Each structure stands twice: as structure tokens, then as C-alpha cells.
Design a protein with these regions (language model features):
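Cysteine-nucleophile active-site neighborhood
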Residues: 317, 341-422
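C-terminal and late-domain segments of enzyme folds
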Residues: 119, 284-287, 299-318, 329, ...
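Acyltransferase
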Residues: 206-244, 281-286, 295-299, 464-496
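ATP-dependent carboxylate-amine ligase catalytic core
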Residues: 8-28, 34-122, 130-157, 166-169
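A short helix->loop->beta-strand "cap" motif at the edges of active sites that frequently abuts
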Residues: 124, 181, 363-367
Length: 496
């Protein structure tokens, strides 16, 4: 499944919200902007730069629609641009939220997968969010340095965070020294403006008391202190892009698999596409295959692009709650995504009927993908934060426990080992993803080799058992759609 760009260009109004560093208020301000800009009947689409799961959940809560991830490490330049064009088509405005500091990419050393890289690939005007509390004229060399670091920075505007109206007047005078970059407004200190964190990121939006009220108050404040007309004009100034061709799942070739990580330059080099045989019938004409996908407070980390690709290959997602549903829904396949099962171990462990059904289904050969939290769920037991163990599915022999520090964090490329008979990833084939987890287990598997894109560090991982492929890595299916095509086809083969 490879999206291609056609030559005819089309307008996609868009902006990217970035910052010099993490903690500047990108997510908070992005959510307020989404609420504010969605007024007057505008149809908005949100995107997150990079692999993060939490920020798109905030975007989704504000807009009531899915938020996509765009990542140049996962999919390379052409495919990233095509994914944006496909998902943004039909919307009045796209708002992308950046990641970390503006130029922070792979390994903290490369530009690949940085906010700048996404702006460059998609030719998107960038608005910097600068936490200017306790700062005035220093913003000038700060912004000038970011502008001069590359030949074309794409930075066009600035919003100052945590400043008063009087401080903003001084800052706007300072900004007169920076031609081509406009001060678009400010956000003063607001009560309840700080959202807590867990593990690596923000807590989830449904856990914040009166979240919608907070966003409404934020949007009302921004309406008073932002130059909305100038911001919308900036979005309209984004150059036209070629829209994706209408290559659907009806026999489209899968996109290239990533190259060997050690050869990675600032832009990923991709192998030639897999010249697979096309199906006898296009996927959209074939019978839809029901695939059960865990989705609740324990399992909420699943890329919208992954879900869309499943559907394009003929899957009919059937969502269920491992916390509340006593039985597995009728389905021919199973996906257990990541999330925070460690926070809900008592509820998960008490649901013994579902635990048994999942174990029996996998033992009987049901095609199953499990990653991170879903991988923990399949273990014999998992300890909570206090060290108490809870029995879970008990399909895998491991016992999982929390570490005081991160076990692994960051991007990886997964390669199926030679001689391994993996159900969906042939020997030597690759797929890209990332890990971030404090939990570890004594049964991590050794069917694949994971390698970091910078530095070349590698380790064994992934469990392959019958039709199960499971491990800690979160996989981004668009980096090798052939894997998910094989998964759906195996589910279809078992669909009675």
C-alpha cells in the first residue's frame, strides 16, 4: 500500500506549532488553537510530529475527530508528504504540533524526524511558541539563531507564552528587528494551566477534571490576545502541494521497507518495493474481516494510520474492553495495543473469563499482534507500582515488573532474524517503530533484532508463537504495509 503524489497541485492551508524546547506549552496552546479555530464552521484536522500517542488524544478530545501522526523516520519524505495530503484533503485547515525542540531529530543529533524536517517536507509555515517569562530582548538572538540555522527555516510567526500584556508590548517592539517573522500574540499565565505527567508524557485528557471547560477558557483567552486574522493568513500562504493519487487498496503495492539502519543518513533510504502478486479481488471487494482490537483506559495507544491501513486491507475493527467485557467479540484476529495496563491490573486480573478466552484463542491459532502494554497483558503476571503481582493471560511465561528508570526509549528498526518462521515478517524484512517503557519482563523474545537508528546499538526482541507476534516495540504499519496485509490475509483465511 503505497501512496503516490500526482503532479496537479492543490491548496492545503496549514500551520505547524513548534518551540525551541520541550515544556514551552506546545500541546496546551495547540489545543486552545484547535478549539478557537474550529469556530465558524471550519473543518480542522490535527497532526502530531513524531511517534507520540498522548498528544493526538488531546487533539481528538478537542475536535472530536482522530489526529494523525507524521514522522519522516517511519515513512521517509515522499510517503510522509503523501500521508499528509491524503489525511488533510477535504479539511479547511490543518494544524500540526511539533515535537521537542524545533531542530531536535534522531538521536538528538540529526534533523530527520524533527519538527523542522516535517515543516520542510510539507512546506508548512511554522509558528514558534516561546515561553518568554522572565525574558525580553533575549528573544531576538534566540529567534535569529533558529532562523539562521538552516537556509530556509520555515519560521513565520511567534506566540509568546506566560507573559503579561505589558511584557508583550515590549516583545513586539523587539520583534521589529526580525523581518519576515510576525508576533502573532501572547498567552498570559492561566489558572489550572498545568497538566500532570506520567512516565514519558502527559496524562490522558479524560483524566483531567473539567478538561473541556479548561479548553474553552483557553480558547476564549486566545481569542482576546491572538491576531487570528494574521494567523489564518499565514496558514493560507502555505504553498500548494500535489495531492495523493487515488491508489487504493485494490492491488496497490506496499510501500518500501526501510533500509539497514546503519546506513541511515539524515533522510531514510528505502529499499525497492516488494513486488508481490496482486490479490485476485481488490481488497475493497473482498469480504470484510472482523478483527478484535482492545480499546479502553488500559489500551489506548494505537496509531490512526494503523487503523486506517487495516481497514484499507479489508479489516472490520471490532473494539472491546479488556477491563469491562467478559467475552472476546466474534472475530478472526486480535490486536492488543499499548497503553497503561499497569494502572488497571486489578480490573484486568479479575476479568478471568476474558483472560481465558484470549489465551484459548491464541493457542488455537488466532492471528494476533500485541505491542508494549498488550505484550505485558499476555505475560504470566505483572507487578503494580507497589510490587504486588497480578495474574493475567498467562500465555507467555514472563513476569513483568517496573524499573526505576526507562528500560528503552526512542526509535528502532526491527528485522526478522534469519531462519525465523515469523507469521507476518519474513526473514530479513524490516519494519520501523519505537519503544518507551519503564516495565520489563524476563521473556522479551528473540525472533527479531531491534536496532537504534543512531549509534547502531541492537538487541533481541519479539515473541513469535503460532500466529502471534508480540513484543515491546510500537510498530508503524505504513513503514512496511506488507506486514499488516499478511496479517489481514491470514485472518481472512481463518474467517468462516
Amino acid at each position: 500500500m503505497s501512496l503516490r503524489l500526482t503532479m496537479q497541485k492543490k491548496s492545503f492551508p496549514r500551520i505547524l506549532i513548534a518551540a525551541p524546547q520541550s515544556g514551552s506549552g506546545k500541546t496546551y496552546l495547540t489545543c486552545g488553537l484547535l478549539r478557537l479555530l474550529s469556530g465558524n464552521g471550519r473543518r480542522l484536522h490535527a497532526f502530531k510530529c513524531g511517534p507520540d500517542f498522548i498528544d493526538p488524544l488531546f487533539h481528538k478530545q478537542v475536535l472530536g475527530i482522530p489526529s494523525g501522526n507524521l514522522d519522516s523516520f517511519f515513512t521517509g519524505e515522499e510517503q510522509t508528504l503523501a500521508l499528509f495530503a491524503k489525511e488533510a484533503e477535504g479539511y479547511d485547515l490543518s494544524v500540526m504540533e511539533g515535537v521537542m525542540g524545533y531542530y531536535d531529530g534522531l538521536g538528538g543529533r540529526l534533523l530527520t524526524a524533527s519538527s523542522y524536517d516535517l515543516a520542510r517536507i510539507t512546506k508548512t509555515p511554522v509558528i514558534l511558541v516561546i515561553n518568554a517569562r522572565g525574558m525580553s530582548r533575549t528573544v531576538v538572538p534566540l529567534i535569529k539563531g533558529l532562523l539562521s540555522y538552516t537556509e530556509e527555516s520555515w519560521i513565520r510567526g511567534v506566540i509568546f507564552n506566560r507573559v503579561s500584556s505589558s511584557a508583550y508590548r515590549i516583545l513586539t517592539k523587539c520583534m521589529e528587528e526580525i523581518p519576515g517573522v510576525k508576533a502573532l500574540g501572547y498567552l498570559p499565565e492561566l489558572k489550572d494551566a498545568s497538566w500532570g505527567s506520567r512516565h514519558l508524557g502527559l496524562i490522558q485528557p479524560e483524566e483531567i477534571p473539567l478538561f473541556q471547560n479548561q479548553i474553552d477558557a483557553l480558547a476564549n483567552q486566545l481569542e482576546e490576545t491572538l491576531d487570528l486574522e494574521a494567523l489564518l493568513s499565514l496558514a493560507q500562504s502555505a504553498p500548494p502541494l500535489p495531492p495523493p493519487s487515488r491508489s487504493s487498496s485494490s492491488g496497490a503495492k506496499p510501500s518500501p521497507s526501510p533500509s539497514k539502519v546503519t546506513a541511515l543518513r539524515e533522510e531514510p533510504t528505502l529499499l525497492s518495493p516488494d513486488q508481490r502478486e496482486e490479490p485476485a479481488l481488490p481488497f475493497f471487494l473482498q469480504k470484510k474481516v472482523p478483527i478484535a482490537i482492545a480499546r479502553d483506559a488500559s489500551f489506548s495507544f494505537f496509531y490512526e494510520e494503523n487503523l486506517r491501513l487495516l481497514k484499507e486491507f479489508g479489516a472490520n475493527p471490532v473494539f472491546f474492553s479488556p477491563m469491562k467485557d467478559a467475552h472476546l467479540p466474534k472475530a478472526s484476529g486480535l490486536i492488543l495495543p499499548g497503553g497503561y495496563p499497569e494502572l488497571h491490573l486489578q480490573e484486568l486480573s479479575r476479568n478471568t473469563s476474558l483472560l481465558q478466552e484470549i489465551r484459548d484463542a491464541i493457542e488455537s491459532g488466532m492471528p494476533t499482534l500485541a505491542e508494549c502494554g498488550g505484550f505485558l497483558y499476555l505475560q504470566k503476571s505483572v507487578q503494580d507500582m507497589g510490587g504486588q503481582s497480578f495474574p493475567l493471560v498467562n500465555l507467555l511465561p514472563g513476569s513483568a515488573h517496573k524499573n526505576s528508570r526507562l528500560v528503552r526509549f526512542g526509535y528502532l528498526e526491527l528485522t526478522a532474524k534469519a531462519g525465523q518462521d515469523l507469521p507476518y515478517l519474513p526473514s530479513g524484512e524490516k519494519i520501523r517503530g519505537h519503544e518507551f517503557h519503564y516495565y520489563d519482563t524476563d521473556a522479551n523474545g528473540e525472533s527479531c533484532t531491534a536496532e537504534k537508528p543512531v549509534g547502531g546499538r541492537s538487541w533481541d526482541c519479539m515473541v513469535s508463537y503460532k500466529n502471534l507476534l508480540a513484543g515491546f516495540p510500537h510498530l508503524y504499519y505504513e513503514s512496511n504495509p506488507a506486514l499488516i496485509r499478511r496479517f489481514v490475509e491470514r485472518c481472512r483465511g481463518l474467517d468462516g
